[in-house]
Regions:
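Active-site- and interface-proximal helix/loop "cap" or "latch" segments in soluble metabolic
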Residues: 19-84
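Short loop/turn motifs at secondary-structure junctions and domain boundaries
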Residues: 1-4
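Short amphipathic alpha-helical patches
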Residues: 16, 60-65, 95-103
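C-terminal charged interaction modules
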Residues: 76-106
Length: 106
C-alpha cells in the first residue's frame, strides 16, 4: 500500500527548549525550516483531539499571534470542506478576522 511521510525534527538547546524546527516531505521533494508547529491529531478510540504545539525560542509574540490567528482561519476552511457547513465556517472566520484586524496582524 502506498504511503507518504512528513518528517518533523526539533533541535533543542541543553534545557530542551526548541531552537530550530525542520520539516521534510520526501515524496514531493520539499523541505524547510519553520518557527512553529501546531499539530492536531484525532484519537478515534478516545474520541478526542491530541495536540502538539512547538515553537522556537526566537519566535516573537507578534509572530505567534499571527500564526495562531491564521491557523484558526485555515481550520475554518478545513471545517467547511469536511462538513459543508459554510454558515458556521464563515461565522467563525469573520470573528477571527475581526480579532486579527484589532490585533493588527492582518
Amino acid at each position: 500500500m502506498p504511503s507518504n511521510k512528513i518528517i518533523l525534527e526539533v533541535i533543542t538547546d541543553e534545557k530542551h527548549v526548541p531552537e530550530t524546527i525542520r520539516w521534510e516531505a520526501p515524496q514531493i521533494m520539499e523541505k524547510g525550516e519553520c518557527k512553529s508547529i501546531a499539530l492536531a491529531l484525532w484519537d478515534g478510540k478516545e474520541n478526542n483531539t491530541l495536540r502538539m504545539d512547538v515553537w522556537t525560542k526566537d519566535m516573537t509574540t507578534d509572530e505567534m499571534k499571527k500564526f495562531l490567528l491564521q491557523s484558526i482561519i485555515t481550520f475554518c476552511d478545513t471545517y467547511e470542506r469536511a462538513t459543508s457547513d459554510s454558515a458556521l465556517a464563515d461565522k467563525i472566520k469573520q470573528f477571527i478576522i475581526n480579532i486579527a484586524k484589532e490585533e493588527k496582524v492582518i
